[in-house]
């Protein structure tokens, strides 16, 4: 069935973060700066990992994928949002809306599992260091990443397919991008299946990775406490702290958005929460991993030194 026949609506209007005219230009400047920092930070980290052979390890392979996802993630909706700040009519086509929503789902879900794979990598490195190179082989790392992307692909297809079956009678999306919760509000057909699907799939994709990460760090903490060397403990804590910060920020904001009861907060609260995991976290990731990682600092110094000479 053609997309035009699937819905009474052929385009949507994105209401944005706020309808106050005085805030449009300041918000445009803030999010433009944020987007530039996010893009340059993640791109720099990707290039740093590619150009430095001593960073070609499982840990940085996962970090490379995380930065790649964050780079794509922020580019899915930020350019459109920036345009909407300066345009009078914030229109997005039906096809464009569904495409934006699909890639948003794909990238967010993939990131959940990439972060889980990173926790497993730290578990093997600290709890089973003698077997690290055997367990975290290039083949194993590739399988973990392929699995992360496949889960993201299949779940995004499921959610997008569910939206394509709906008939939309209204077109004002109370959000700055095509997000599933405000989209369901516009349907004039039953959204019960979509809501159940959202709760089950989002619950699975947040709770299962969170449990796996908690279990991994439970074993890691146990191993660290058994270490007799203070230097060893300090190095282990330093290695894991960046990942723990990123996981807490990302999973916490996603859980608040998708697992809270629908009556406990308005769509405006959802906008604020989504700004956090869509914009703030991708911007913070390269900064957190760079500032707290000795290997990245050394690699950056080498690159800067080479450029001077």
Q: Which residues does each predicted region cover?
A:
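Transmembrane helical core of 7TM receptor-like proteins
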Residues: 1-309
């Amino acid at each position: 069935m053609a997309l035009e026949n699937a819905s009474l609506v052929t385009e949507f209007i994105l209401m944005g973060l706020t309808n106050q005219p005085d805030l449009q230009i300041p918000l445009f400047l803030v999010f433009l700066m944020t987007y530039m920092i996010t893009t340059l930070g993640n791109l720099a980290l990707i290039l740093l990992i590619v150009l430095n052979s001593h960073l070609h390890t499982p840990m940085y392979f996962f970090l490379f994928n995380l930065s790649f996802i964050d780079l794509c993630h922020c580019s899915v909706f930020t350019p459109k949002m920036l345009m909407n700040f300066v345009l009078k009519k914030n229109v997005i086509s039906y096809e464009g809306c569904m495409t934006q929503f699909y890639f948003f789902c794909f990238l967010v879900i993939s990131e959940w599992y990439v972060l889980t794979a990173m926790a497993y990598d730290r578990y093997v490195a600290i709890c089973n260091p003698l077997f690290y190179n055997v367990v975290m082989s290039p083949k194993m790392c590739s399988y973990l990443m392929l699995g992360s992307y496949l889960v993201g692909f299949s779940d995004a297809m499921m959610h997008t397919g569910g939206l394509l079956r709906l008939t939309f009678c209204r077109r004002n999306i109370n959000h700055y991008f095509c997000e599933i919760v405000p989209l369901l509000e516009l349907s004039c057909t039953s959204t019960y299946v979509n809501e159940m699907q959202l709760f089950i799939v989002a619950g699975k994709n947040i709770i299962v990775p969170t449990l796996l990460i908690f279990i991994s760090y439970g074993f890691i903490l146990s191993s660290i406490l058994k270490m007799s060397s203070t230097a060893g403990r300090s190095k282990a804590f330093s290695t894991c702290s960046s990942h723990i910060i990123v996981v807490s920020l990302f999973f916490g904001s996603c859980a608040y958005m998708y697992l809270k009861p629908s009556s406990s907060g308005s769509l405006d609260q959802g906008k604020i929460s989504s700004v956090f995991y869509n914009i703030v976290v991708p911007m913070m990731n390269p900064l957190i991993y760079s500032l707290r990682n000795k290997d990245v600092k050394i690699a950056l110094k080498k690159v800067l030194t080479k450029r001077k000479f």
